[in-house]
Every structure is written in C-alpha cells, then in structure tokens.
C-alpha cells in the first residue's frame, strides 16, 4: 500500500515537521511559502512573476532518504524541502499529469524537481548525490516531483495514496 509517511509545510522558507493534519488548498499547502497561483520561487518571480505555479507541492519518496542515508548522508523527511514524503510509489517513473488522490485531495504531477545548490548548503555533496546518469548519459533527477493541487482536503501522515494515470500516450516527467 502507498501512503504518506511524513508531511511538512514551509513557513518563512523553513521546513517544519508537524504532528497534526494540514490542508491542501487549491493553490498548494495552506500556509506554505510556495502556495499560490503564480510562481513563488524568488528566481522564477524575478524572470516572470505571472508564470503559473507548477511547483505548489513537492513530494519525495522515502526510499530516497534511505538511499542517501546508506551513502553516508544524514537526511530526514522534510530536510530537502519536500512537503510530502511517500512510501511505496516510484514517484520518478510516474508520467506527467498523473493524479495522486489522498482522501478527497487531488495532486496533479507537473514534473521533476530540479535540485539546486541549496542542498549542498545543507550537506556537502548532497546535490551530486541526487543526480545520476542513465546508460545513455541522460541526467536523472532523483530529488522528487512537483505538482499542483486540483482538489483540497485535510491530509495527514498515514493517509493512503491512490495513483490515477493519465490517458496514454504518457509523457515522461521533465524538470519544472
């Protein structure tokens, strides 16, 4: 079964663990620094503040934390900027526009998180650890996926996640 293992909100650009439920609003996680209809990230606002916000919510698979910890890093859920940590879903292999249903909430996947140098500010070498290359030399981004909230609901740690694939042909996730 796939489920939420941890849930976080960003307040003043910090990520905090919570032990209660949080509301997914139609613009993202209620109270989160990235919540909004248009882009919230400073670099994207500087380029064009009217761009739609395709990064309302960030999900990482718990299996990545395990991989990083086995490689010598000390990473806990929420420390890499994610709002939701999942277990049992291969997030990186989901196609664009996949919908994740958590109770009545619906998240539509928009693309891959493009990791940035802030990861190295947290732990040296972490950015390189979440990047890889496939057998053809193409870059693999392992730092999770981004999405938008289609339908809001209060969600909490332990809630089940149902995956709804879009109609084929499927589009591979690209960085957003």
Question: Where are the model-predicted features located?
Answer:
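Electropositive, beta-rich accessory/interaction domains or terminal extensions
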Residues: 1-97, 101-102, 111, 168-176
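Glycine-rich active-site loops that engage anionic ligands at enzyme catalytic sites
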Residues: 86, 93-149
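Structural motif
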Residues: 98, 153, 159-160
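Short, charged, solvent-exposed linker or helix-capping segments at domain edges/interfaces
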Residues: 120-121, 159, 173-175
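Residue-level signal for alpha-helical context at structural boundaries
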Residues: 137, 164, 175-176
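Protruding loop/beta-arch "assembly-hinge" segments enriched in small, turn-prone residues
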Residues: 157-161, 168-170
């Amino acid at each position: 079964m796939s489920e939420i293992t941890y849930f976080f909100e960003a307040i003043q650009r910090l990520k905090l663990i919570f032990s209660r439920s949080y509301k997914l609003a139609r613009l993202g996680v209620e109270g989160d620094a990235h919540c909004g209809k248009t882009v919230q990230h400073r670099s994207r606002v500087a380029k064009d503040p009217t761009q739609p916000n395709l990064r309302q919510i960030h999900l990482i698979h718990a299996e990545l934390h395990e991989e990083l910890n086995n490689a010598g890093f000390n990473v806990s859920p929420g420390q890499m900027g994610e709002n939701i940590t999942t277990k049992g879903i291969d997030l990186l292999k989901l196609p664009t526009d996949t919908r994740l249903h958590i109770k009545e909430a619906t998240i539509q996947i928009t693309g891959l998180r493009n990791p940035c140098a802030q990861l190295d500010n947290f732990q040296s070498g972490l950015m390189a650890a979440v990047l890889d290359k496939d057998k053809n030399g193409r870059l693999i981004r392992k730092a999770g996926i981004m999405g938008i909230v289609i339908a809001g609901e209060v969600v909490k740690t332990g809630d089940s996640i149902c995956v709804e694939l879009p109609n084929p042909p499927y589009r591979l996730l690209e960085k957003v």
